[in-house]
Amino acid sequence: MKKRVTIYTDGACSGNPGRGGWGALMMYGTVNRELSGYEPATTNNRMELTAAIEGLDALKEPCVVDLYSDSAYLVNALNQGWLKRWTTNNWTTSAKKSVENIDLWKKILKLVTLHQVTFHKVKGHSDNPFNNRCDELARQAIKNNS
């Protein structure tokens, strides 16, 4: 039976584009693990995707995952079928434009085939302590690299 893991993620950018950070909080049973990172030149959406990638990539074996993010971009792409349509349409949007962040979406595709992931949208900057912690991790990563 696969382990059930909860992951909260968030990305932040100082300027968009600008310096960026991401944070992830992984929870399995009584064990919590925090991850974070920094990019010198990026966008908020790239940081949101990177947080999810890093959280999922840190899992040592295939798991059942509940992933919580305040990024509508990330959650809607998976839950509303955007990602599936983009791959079917050779990475073009319904407006016939090239999909942004293809490199990261390809990594997410690989990870969601390895793990059984359910994506959940949470309200950002509200009263969710786990999402707020991820925001702190992302912003601290930017601050630590200033």
UniProtKB/Swiss-Prot annotation:
SUPFAM superfamilies, per database record: Ribonuclease H-like (SSF53098)
A cellular component annotation (GO) from this entry: cytoplasm
Gene3D superfamilies linked: Ribonuclease H-like superfamily/Ribonuclease H (3.30.420.10)
First-listed, main subcellular location of the protein, grouped into a coarse class:
cytoplasm
Annotated disulfide bonds: none
Which residues take part in binding Mg(2+) 1?
D10, E48, D70
Q: Subunit notes for this chain?
A: Monomer.
Q: Which Pfam families match?
A: RNase_H
Q: Which keywords does this chain's UniProt record carry?
A: Cytoplasm, Endonuclease, Hydrolase, Magnesium, Metal-binding, Nuclease
Q: CDD domains recorded for this chain?
A: RNase_HI_prokaryote_like
What does the UniProt record say this protein does? Endonuclease that specifically degrades the RNA of RNA-DNA hybrids.
User: Per UniProt, where does Mg(2+) 2 bind?
Assistant: D10, D135
Which residues does the UniProt record annotate as the domain RNase H type-1?
1-143
Required cofactor(s): Mg(2+)
Query: Can you quote the record's cofactor note?
Result: Binds 1 Mg(2+) ion per subunit. May bind a second metal ion at a regulatory site, or after substrate binding.
Q: Spell out the reaction equation it catalyses.
A: Endonucleolytic cleavage to 5'-phosphomonoester
* Name of the protein this chain belongs to: Ribonuclease H
From which organism does this entry originate? Chlorobium limicola (strain DSM 245 / NBRC 103803 / 6330)
Provide any one GO MF term from the record. Answer: nucleic acid binding
Give any single GO term for biological process. DNA replication, removal of RNA primer
Family stated for the protein in its record: Belongs to the RNase H family.
Q: What is its EC number?
A: 3.1.26.4
As for subcellular location, the record says:
Cytoplasm
